[in-house]
């Protein structure tokens, strides 16, 4: 079965690219770029012997760079336009900042400048996702890779040290746990979660750079080894500031915006409870949950920021009483 690759409309593309990347101080001081700054300082201090590079790249990337160069299989579900935004049949809005790493590795290998280098790549990523308090379609991410030539080769203790260096710079007082997980472009991978309000929240994934990624980039994997880490900056800021809803980070409310220029604890600006409404929405039976969430956001336009969560509970035409069918104007294929 062919992978679904629907190209996004030019209007949706323009709207996506118009969203400011808050990892970049050029777009104004924000808690997100303050976290990036703290992480960078910690890395420079902890690994003073390594060359440090921060890079930024276009969010529009070839599908090959987003998936193939990072060893994602051709049938990986993430390639589908159910989850990924296609600009053309062969170009996507990056789903992770890791998409730029193989290209950086190739350029570094050609330049012969890789001895011991840490490269960081913060930026905005784009995914088709469901709507809830910890997920959004446009997320801030940051990759941290360290590539070294010769011995000693990087191993699990080195990876844990990198994780703890980053966590110590942002959320030092929080307990974390690391779970074994597989990633296409790493070996000995880990998923790291932080304990927040009695529950575990995933904030980063990491591992040792896959030898094949190094080889395909022009680096001899017998000579080079690496560490790879990608973190969700929005969630880190939520933890630091005590924010429970990811939408708050981009709020235009002046009372909230004033609080987003530092890493102080967030002060709730309203003591009113959330308003709940049950709304019926008719759509074709072949639509996924991600499709429905995106359609609703499109219909609401700027007012979509008021949506806290969409709970998906489907009921087919045949299951509805005749009066409900009449009120909804629903068709048999919906």
Question: Where does each model-flagged region fall?
Answer:
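Generic alpha-helical secondary structure
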Residues: 28, 32-36, 152-163, 285-293
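Extended C-terminal subregions enriched in glycine
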Residues: 154-190
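Conserved alpha/beta core surface patches that mediate binding of polyanionic ligands
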Residues: 2-4, 95-139, 251-264, 301-331
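Short secondary-structure junctions
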Residues: 43-50, 113, 167-175, 298-310
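A generic structural motif
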Residues: 26-28, 145-153, 235, 283-287, ...
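Class II aminoacyl-tRNA synthetase-like tRNA-binding/catalytic domains
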Residues: 1-135, 147, 200, 205-214, ...
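A conserved active-site cap/scaffold subdomain adjacent to cofactor or substrate pockets
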Residues: 116, 136-164, 168, 217-251
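A carboxyl-terminal module marker
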Residues: 179-334
């Amino acid at each position: 079965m062919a992978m679904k690759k629907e190209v996004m409309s030019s209007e949706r593309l323009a709207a996506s690219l118009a969203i400011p990347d808050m990892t970049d101080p050029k777009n104004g001081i924000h808690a997100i770029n303050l976290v990036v700054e703290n992480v960078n300082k910690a890395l420079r201090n902890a690994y003073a012997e390594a060359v440090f590079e921060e890079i930024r790249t276009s969010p529009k990337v070839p599908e090959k760079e987003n998936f193939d160069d990072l060893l994602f299989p051709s049938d990986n579900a993430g390639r589908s336009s159910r989850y990924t935004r296609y600009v053309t049949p062969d170009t996507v809005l990056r789903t992770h900042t890791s998409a730029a790493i193989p290209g950086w590795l190739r350029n570094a290998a050609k330049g012969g400048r890789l001895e011991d280098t840490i490269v960081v790549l913060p930026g905005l990523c784009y995914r088709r996702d469901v709507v809830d308090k910890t997920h959004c379609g446009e997320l801030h991410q940051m990759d941290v890779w360290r590539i070294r030539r010769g011995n000693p080769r990087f191993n699990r203790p080195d990876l844990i040290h990198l994780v703890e260096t980053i966590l110590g710079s942002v959320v030092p007082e929080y307990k974390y746990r690391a779970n074994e997980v597989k990633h296409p472009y790493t070996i000995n991978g880990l998923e790291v979660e932080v304990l927040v309000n009695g529950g575990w929240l995933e904030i980063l994934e990491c591992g040792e750079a896959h030898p094949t990624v190094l080889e395909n980039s022009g680096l001899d994997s017998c000579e080079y080894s690496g560490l790879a880490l990608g973190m969700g900056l929005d969630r880190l800021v939520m933890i630091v500031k005590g924010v429970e809803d990811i939408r708050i980070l981009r709020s235009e409310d002046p009372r909230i915006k004033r609080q987003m220029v530092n890493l102080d604890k967030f002060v709730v600006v309203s003591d009113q409870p959330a308003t709940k409404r049950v709304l019926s929405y008719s759509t074709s039976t072949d639509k996924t949950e991600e499709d429905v969430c995106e359609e609703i956001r499109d219909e609401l336009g700027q007012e979509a920021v008021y949506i806290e969560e969409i709970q998906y509970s489907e009921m087919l035409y045949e299951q509805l009483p005749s009066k409900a069918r009449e009120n909804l104007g629903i068709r048999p294929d919906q």
